[in-house]
Amino acid sequence: MIVKAEIGNQDPIYIEANKYAHQADSSILISQGGTKVLVTVCVSEEPLCGIDFAPLSVDYRERSFAWGKIPGGFIKREGKPTDREVLISRVIDRPLRPLMPKGFLNEVVVTCLTLSADDKYDPDVLAITGASAALVSSSVPFEGPIAGMRVCRVNGEFIINPTYEQRKNSDMDIVMALSKDAIVMVEGGAKEVEESVLLDALFFGLEKGQTLIKAQEELVDSLKPEKKPIGHIGLSDDMANKLKEIASSKILEAFSIEDKKERSKALKDVYAQAMQKLGISKEQEFDFLVSFKDLESQLMREQILKYKKRIDGRKETDIRPITIEMHPLERPHGSAVFTRGQTQALATVTLAPKDEAQLVETIFEGETFKRFMLHYNFPPFSTGEARPWGPPRRREIGHGALAERALEPLLAKEEDFPYIIRVVSDILESNGSSSMATVCAGSLALFDAGVPMKKHVAGIAMGLIKDGDNFVILTDILGDEDHLGDMDFKVAGTRDGVTSVQMDIKIKGLSKDIMIKALNQAKEARMFILDKLYEAIPEPNKEVSKYAPKAQVMKIPEDKVGLVIGPAGKNIKYIKEQFGASVWIDGANAYINAPTIEAVNKAADFINSLIQEVEVGGVYEGKVIRVENYGLFVEVLPGKVGLLHASAMTEKPTINVGDTIKVKVMAIDEQNRLNLCSPDYQKPENQERPRKEQLNRKPHHRK
């Protein structure tokens, strides 16, 4: 069964069911142009016990053969998932999870495998649509379909699922997931676009993406898959009502405690007391836990919707108290601590030479070097957990990418600031919105490090409580508001526009009115936080840290690049050995790095001497490299040797190889050979020019 969807002016998308992988519960081959992604769904026979969340896992993988490459590195096969694969797995997972019905506890595994990738269409959005198509055609009672779309803007015009070339010229790159009538997920970056433009882009995508929804509905109508039953979790209605009578007032008392740790302890006490009063057995404990969490959510939502009262007593638009500590650490090249309520981020900046850039392999560009990196760490102690600290999890990689995307558009060009930049954010304490605290702390630390950022960047997380047509948008959400609410909408940017956005929801979609209010409220909050950042450090420091390496970039004429490098890298090695400076040639740019500015200047002077042209009439201090009876061979610039004939010397002292003398360039002949003389030499008017065979008995060559 194959269905087709037309998407704007791009190649059509084809969705083919059950062509491959027949042992899976369902499989979809989705393609656009030369890009093909195989998506499979596998479902366990029996539901899992003791969990209150959808046991869904999503894995996205790319094979190097998909774009005709062999994996780089010593081992020529794919290994653990790359950051790109992790990020795409998250983008697929996030819109699917809210549409898994509560009570369906069978384990569901969605696997997306890119089999072919052309140089036009990114497989990530195809994988989102393919995953939805695989689920609606499987035995999973998935409440879809949804579709994945990419929206860009080129020269003021929105483009759906743009090609790679179009994306390079775009001022925004937004991946979104949509249902039949609403937006369900947003992820993307922009170059300071206004909120109204972002909103227009999203609803343009919602309109154009309906062809993919209709194609999946056509697929389901044809296949008519049989769905597995949905179970019930939680206490019976009678027991749930008794729990509400016993625990409601005490839960509300606990909610009034501002401190997260104390509030959590109070809720645990209420939980234990209610469990004892109701006589809950060990076998009933899981159902009791589910109902207790449902009651917490219900009470919190009622307090906000009816009384506009939040857990910590704030109003819906209030931001928690903000404190900033600049340069708390001496040796890192830049550092800052940003604290908002009980969320605290320590950001540090490290500057490094170009040869320390991160090598990455991408579908469209092959091997490239990444200049700016932001790594986000979420240690267990940030939430008071007693567990070992392992390698970065998917969430940490995702939050780091979100913050990196927010800050990167404001960095100076590499030609103006020739450093590799690494920002590390360690979350020291967390109670909601640690990724947006990372954006703020990262901006402060970059200013502290002397990175010439164009502007400060700040971020804020927005929440939503919705019941029918009644809704409240919350600014600067707590962890509990994120957990028990309907939306986590993160927006980062400058005073002039949005640079990064991420939205996840737990309901089936958001209306345009909600999106407008959320973006406008987020803008007000962002302006407030930006004022705090500018108060702390109004502009980047003029100089980098004394502990940072020193750097300079030089423009090299294209025809001189080989001369600068030298045979087998001779000149680059000489600069390293002689001055302690490293040189990286990239196109027509030479990037010089050294521990001191003196070493950088010496290396730059040497490179200038290599590319400098010898001028007739110019006086140079040269090095004698050969002595003959008829004159001296003098190197006036590296690689440029001329003859100082005995007849052109005003004095004839004893000179040895290695001595330095001042010489003047009399002439450059048609073979680019240099004729030299003493600086004060005056050629007699009637003196004949020395014969060529006298001047040049031996061929000149570079030493």
UniProtKB/Swiss-Prot annotation:
- Key words of the record: Cytoplasm, Magnesium, Metal-binding, Nucleotidyltransferase, RNA-binding, Transferase
Which stretches make up the KH domain? Answer: 549-607
Its cofactor is: Mg(2+)
Where found? Cytoplasm
- One GO CC annotation: cytosol
Known catalytic reactions: RNA(n+1) + phosphate = RNA(n) + a ribonucleoside 5'-diphosphate
Originating gene? pnp
Query: What are the Basic and acidic residues biased-composition ranges?
Result: 682-696
Query: Which family, according to the similarity comment?
Result: Belongs to the polyribonucleotide nucleotidyltransferase family.
Protein's UniProt name: Polyribonucleotide nucleotidyltransferase
Q: Which residues cross the membrane?
A: none
- Describe the function of this protein: Involved in mRNA degradation. Catalyzes the phosphorolysis of single-stranded polyribonucleotides processively in the 3'- to 5'-direction.
Q: Where does Mg(2+) bind?
A: 482, 488
Q: What is its EC number?
A: 2.7.7.8
* Residue segments, region Disordered: 677-703
Superkingdom of the source?
A: Bacteria
Q: Which residues form the S1 motif domain?
A: 617-679
**Primary enzyme class:** transferase
Q: Which InterPro entries match?
A: ExoRNase_PH_dom1, ExoRNase_PH_dom2, ExoRNase_PH_dom2_sf, KH_dom, KH_dom_type_1, KH_dom_type_1_sf, NA-bd_OB-fold, PNPase
Q: Name one GO molecular function term.
A: polyribonucleotide nucleotidyltransferase activity
Please name the GO terms of the biological process aspect recorded for this protein, alphabetically.
mRNA catabolic process; RNA processing
